[in-house]
Amino acid sequence: VCCRGLLGAASVGRQNRFEIVYNLLSLREVWDMFGVFFFNHPDLRILTDYGFEGHPFRKYDDEVKRVVAEPVELAQEFRKFDLNSPWEAFPAYR
C-alpha cells in the first residue's frame, strides 16, 4: 500500500479536535494508473485490461522525454458535455 496523500482536519467542538486522513493506493493501482513498477510482484495489472498500453494518470511522455500537460476533452461521439450548467444534462426538468 502506498500513501497517496495526507490531510489534517480540526473540529473545534470535539474533545479530540484533530483528525488525520490518509489516502492510500494499493501497489496494483499505483502500477496501473501511474506506471510505478514494484519488484517481485507476480501480477500488477488490476484496473485496466491486460492489452492496455500505457498508464492513464502518467504525465511523462517517453517520446519527448518530459512531462506533458494536455487539456482534457470530455466530448464523445454520442454525447457533448456542457459543464457550465449542471441542469443542461436534464432537459426534461427545465
Curated annotation (Swiss-Prot):
Query: How does this protein lie in the membrane?
Result: Peripheral membrane protein
**Sequence intervals crossing the membrane:** none
Cellular location of this protein?
Answer: Mitochondrion inner membrane
Catalytic reaction list: a ubiquinone + NADH + 5 H(+)(in) = a ubiquinol + NAD(+) + 4 H(+)(out)
Look up keyword Membrane and say if it applies.
yes
Which UniProt keywords are given for this protein, alphabetically ordered?
Electron transport, Membrane, Mitochondrion, Mitochondrion inner membrane, NAD, Oxidoreductase, Respiratory chain, Translocase, Transport, Ubiquinone
EC number(s) on record?
7.1.1.2
Task: Tell me the protein family, please.
Answer: Belongs to the complex I 30 kDa subunit family.
Under which name does UniProt file this protein?
Answer: NADH dehydrogenase [ubiquinone] iron-sulfur protein 3, mitochondrial
